[in-house]
Amino acid sequence: RYTRQSGVNLLRMWGGGIAESDYFFQLCDELGLLVWQEFWMTGDTRHPHDKALYMSNVESTVKRIRNHPSLAYYVASNESTEMTGTPELLNQLDGTRGYQMQSECAGVHDGSPYKQVNPMQHYENTASPRGSRVDGFNPEYGAPTLPTVEILREMMDEKDLWPINKEVWDYLDGNGFHLMTTMYTDLVNHYGKSSSIDEFAQKGQLLGAINSKSIWEVWNYNKLDYGDRFCSGLLFWYHNCSMRQVASRMWDWSLEPTASLYHTANSLEPLHAQFDYLKNTVSVVNDFYRSFDNYKVTAQVYDINSRKVFEESAVVNLPADGVANDALTIRFPDGISQVHFIKLILKDKKGKEISSNFYWRSNDKYEGKTTLTGPAASGFEDLSKLRASKVKLAYKVREEGDNYFVDITMRNTSNQIAFFNQLQFLNAKMSPIRPSFYTDNFFSLTPGEKKTVTIETAKEKLSEGAMLVLKGWNIDSQKYKLK
């Protein structure tokens, strides 16, 4: 369900893993998710000794899953070669799906990046040391996100949380594979040095959000023939966490979402306005197989005092399954505050708001791929100067069948931006109720802006003393005991 919410529509069953259950494929059928199914060989293993047993497993698996409409593609291995006779067997048993020998052939290049990089490198297409990766189809492209502080506390002792115990954190990051105690920490510190794990984890969500947004939006920009390079898609590596780790993704092993889920969902909405940190341009993406004419995209820029210092609009005609690239350029005023904010609004020809987007940006110059500099990466210390804001919250609870819902309406009643707010549905012990499904989270509100969010969970997950919490960068936390 989180996958469906994120907007991701193709899942890779990696060759080092398994063939999923019938229930998994049934869910993919129902949710409209496609599956890239690899068989059980990887580049770091040998071919099986018992070929007959292997081919028997391929046959039984294909017979079991071939009638699922979600099954899109067969791949014989991950970064290896095929067992002789595999394509012939697949043609005999199915013959209706595409096939390739391994994950990095037939015009599909090898993957990366996997670790933390400067988010500016996604726009520049220098994130991989192997060369250009924002082109064609990429089978492995991704970045980490720190889990929420509640997950971190469940993962290790308080003494190892803060100050960060590098040995423990690296152990929980595959011997430091994703660079969480090095580059990720350095980038988090560009939001200001933290004095507690709570503060560090909050800033870690900001970096995770930028990681995801920069990846998906640069691929949006280069969709098909519309951008600087031809891009047909990517498989996010890796999609889920198979164990507790400090390098999370859109959600943690325990099904606790991170900011990356909601910023990915925003980036992959079917009609989407987006900003390019390298070009300072605004583009509009259309994933529908129909065109839309006379849409209006508006870009607003606010300084650190929430004063609007720039606003410009452009009328765009959106081609079917296409992109209106560089519809307008944002001209940041001379003397603008070191940290500032960008609000994008997309409206249809009748003036109805279709979507919106929000960014934080610094004046720091990008000095190249060997640095941790740039307007998406550094110079955010002045966020600590953001003045206090106020958000008025009202909610209603309802029940439908076995599920419990909290419908929340929020409005920024101040003249200051309410930055990076998080809703939480907690039990009496102030631990997150999991899984709970939020229609949005980790969001910002401009002065006067209104927002609605619905939280859903199973009734069986509820307990006495359930709490609704709203907290944020520059608002006082609010707590409500739900009945």
PLM-predicted stretches and their roles:
Residues T126-Y302, V309:
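Substrate-binding clefts and catalytic carboxylate motifs of secreted carbohydrate-active enzymes
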Residues R1-D110:
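Active-site mouth of glycoside hydrolases
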Residues L386-F443, T454:
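C-terminal accessory/binding modules appended to enzymatic or scaffolding proteins
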Residues F288-N305, T413-P432, K471-W473:
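Short acidic, flexible loop segments centered on an aromatic residue
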Residues E256-V285, Y302, N363-G401:
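Low-complexity, acidic Ser/Thr/Pro/Gly-rich terminal tails and inter-domain linkers that flank the onset
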Residues V62-W169:
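Active-site region of glycoside hydrolase catalytic domains
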Residues Y295-V297, D303-S337, I433-E460:
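Intrinsically disordered, low-complexity Pro/Gly/Ser/Thr-rich segments with frequent PxxP/GP/PP motifs
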